[in-house]
Structures are given as C-alpha cells and as structure tokens.
UniProtKB/Swiss-Prot annotation:
GO terms for molecular function: 4 iron, 4 sulfur cluster binding; metal ion binding; rRNA (uridine-C5-)-methyltransferase activity. This is Uncharacterized RNA methyltransferase SPy_1606/M5005_Spy1319. Residues 2-60 form the TRAM domain. It comes from Streptococcus pyogenes serotype M1. Belongs to the class I-like SAM-binding methyltransferase superfamily. RNA M5U methyltransferase family. CDD domains: AdoMet_MTases (cd02440). InterPro entries: MeTrfase_TrmA_AS (IPR030390), MeTrfase_TrmA_CS (IPR030391), NA-bd_OB-fold (IPR012340), SAM-dependent_MTases_sf (IPR029063), TRAM_dom (IPR002792), U5_MeTrfase_fam (IPR010280). Signal peptide: none annotated. [4Fe-4S] cluster binds at C73, C79, C82, C162. The lineage of its organism: Bacteria, Bacillati, Bacillota, Bacilli, Lactobacillales. Its EC number is 2.1.1.-. S-adenosyl-L-methionine binds at Q283, Y312, D333, D381.
Amino acid sequence: MVVKVKQKIPLKIKRMGINGEGIGFYQKTLVFVPGALKGEDIFCQITAVKRNFAEAKLLTVNKASKNRVKPACSVYETCGGCQIMHLAYPKQLDFKDDVIRQALKKFKPTGYEQFEIRPTLGMKKPDHYRAKLQFQLRSFGGTVKAGLFSQGSHRLVPIDNCLVQDQLTQDIINKITQLVDKYKLPIYNERKIAGIRTIMVRKAQASDQVQIIVVSSKEVRLANFIGELTKAFPQVKTVALNSNRSKSSEIYGDETEILWGQEAIHEEVLDYGFALSPRAFYQLNPQQTEVLYGEVVKALDVGSKDHIIDAYCGVGSIGFAFAGKVKSVRGMDIIPEAIEDAQKNAKAMGFDNAYYEAGKAEDIISKWYKQGYRADAVIVDPPRTGLDDKLLKTILHYQPKQMVYVSCNTSTLARDLVQLTKVYDVHYIQSVDMFPHTARTEAVVKLQKRV
C-alpha cells in the first residue's frame, strides 16, 4: 500500500460509494472520503489503511461540484445520522438509483444488466419527515442531553433541532430532557449498566397521537415526569417502560409495560386505519409510506381467488391493502405485540380472511405449506439483513407465482436476487426515497415465476 495513516494527499473523486462517500484513486490505491462528491478535486488525510483500500477525511475542496450545497444542519458533520445532505436533493435521487446498480453489479443476479431500474420517487419537501426518534440520554457536566452517537463511536452528539425529525417529536424530546433533569431521574451509566439509556418518541401522522418508550436498565419512578409531560403535550397518549439490562448495543429489552395511557395510537395508510402499539414496527416516514405501499399494490396482480402471504408483516399494514380483494391474507412477525395489533386491526376492519401468527417467517411459512396452505403471491419486507437463508429455500421450494420484495438494503437485496432469479424474472425495481439526506433507500421489486 502506497499510503500511510496521517498522510495528506490530493485526490480526484471519480464516483460515489454506496454509503455516500466519495471514491478516488491515489497511485492505484482506492480511497474512500466521506463528504466528497463525484467530480471534485480535494485534499484529504488518510485515517485508515486496509488491505485493498484506504479511508480518509476531507480537509479541503479545491474544486467543488456544481451539485454541492451547504447543509442547513449545524451538527451534520459530527452527527452521522445523514450522509449526503451536502448533495443537492435531485442528485440524491440519482445517487440512490446508482446505489442499486452498484449492488447488482457486485452480486450479478441472473439477467441483472437488463433489469428495469425506475427513477427513485422523491419527496416534494424532504425535511422533518421522520415520525419516530430514538435518542440516547447522557449527562454532560450535570446536565442531561439527548441525541445520537457520532458515527462509529459512543460519543453522544446532543441534538435539539434535527432537520429531518418531525417537529413535534423534537419538541417532546427537548421537554423530556428538561424533565429528566428537573426530577433527577437516573441517566444511563455504561460502567454500571444502570439508568435511562434511550427515549423513543413516535407520532401517528393521521391522528397526531404520540407514544413514548422510556428504555431503562431498572425501575424508575416516572409519575411526576409523566404528569408534567402529558400536561405540556396532550398529544401524548401512551408512556411505556422497556426494561433493558443487557450490556449489548441492542436498544430494547424483551419486556415493555404501559405505565400510562392507551395501549396503541391510531395511524392510517392507503385510506385504512390501524392501531400501532409502542414496540410494533412501522415505517418512520409516513408520507413516503403511502408511496411505498402504493407501489407494492401496483406490483401484485391478484384477484378474488388468490391467497397472499405477507412476511415480516408488522401490524399488517401492507397486507390490509389486499385483504378486501383476495381470498386470504396470512402474515407473521417476530414481535408478538405487532401480531396482536395485526389481529385487532383485521378484526376492526372486518377482514375475517386475514390471519396472523407470531414467529419467524422461515418457520411459519414451512408449517403452513405442510398444513396444505398454498400462496399465489408472497410479499417480503425483511430487515436490513435481508432474507433468512431458510426462508429463501422455502420460497424457492414452493415457488408462489408472484413475489414482491420490499428492501431497505440494496446490498442484501442484490445478494438475495442471486438465488431468487434462479426461479423468478425481475420485472422492475422501483426505488422510493424513504430517508432523504441519507445514503439509504427503499426498493420495491416485482418478481414473476419464470414459465
């Protein structure tokens, strides 16, 4: 390797990497530089040298891209929550198209060069879109602060005005830090593994109802805290306590107790409403969720005789879009509270053809097929890790005629398509910008069993 740590070098940025970093070559060495844009001439300092590449930090931009903009966020460079806020928004959408192409080129699923990759669907106003926040709490010189850990560290960056966070949720977390200070509530101590470590605030866009989870390693007295908070913000309908005594970086423990208020808040998507309990998964960008789920509906051609499996179903929100026009919908999720919500939601909407069960998709689908159930179509919306290998084998064994893959990680999507394209043709990939100013995107893939 021709470069060394701390060495300062000039660099011409040739392209953008999948994490939003600029990529250039210095004497044939591949160098990744966060904050740099394609076409720029920069000066940077090497921070790490690996076997096949090096990493560097941006020092100066000698020739700026015409697509560079000044980020409005005061903590953009230290927070790490957003990666491409310095790139003009229309070009962010182009970047996300390219991220999909890069992933496909790396894994090379059958026929990938002919896949139709449709332009990413963006937002008219790509700010204050996050309806959910999960901030860590720490004590700074005796004062409580809330925020996010800086990229790749355990150093908290206090945030009191996040530009991608819904304003009400930001106002509530700001009030929470004041009240935690006021009532001297115990703040998490990493050495002792004790105290309040995380606060989750989620708002339902349709109803303006808010739920809060306090994540703590031990019981905390919150009566006065709850009383003052709910008086200041009547939109708060639920306060729950999640017990997490683990030393790991997992945000939540297994036990969640409603301390105050109702069990769920009311949300709506595609003209139907549903209950959302504190631990149930739901997309964090409600405006774009309408777009995303609308694309899922377009991608499946089903009718009154068809049966659908909605894997990783959460509270049932995707499957409900089909329940009124198909023979049956079955879904599963590993979070029991989400399945309870799905069952209640189906009953409330009169969908007696919808059935939900708690457990792993790879286990439950196999069980259903052994019991004689046959799906004409399957919808998968897995976490960033992609499809479990056992689930992939199950799908390829039973081969439902249609499939829609909703992905939040283009790399694991491309990896899974290597297996799926042995049986299925990819009709198109439609990217939806669920996370403006970040390097992440969501993609809807329409697959049809090959004849």
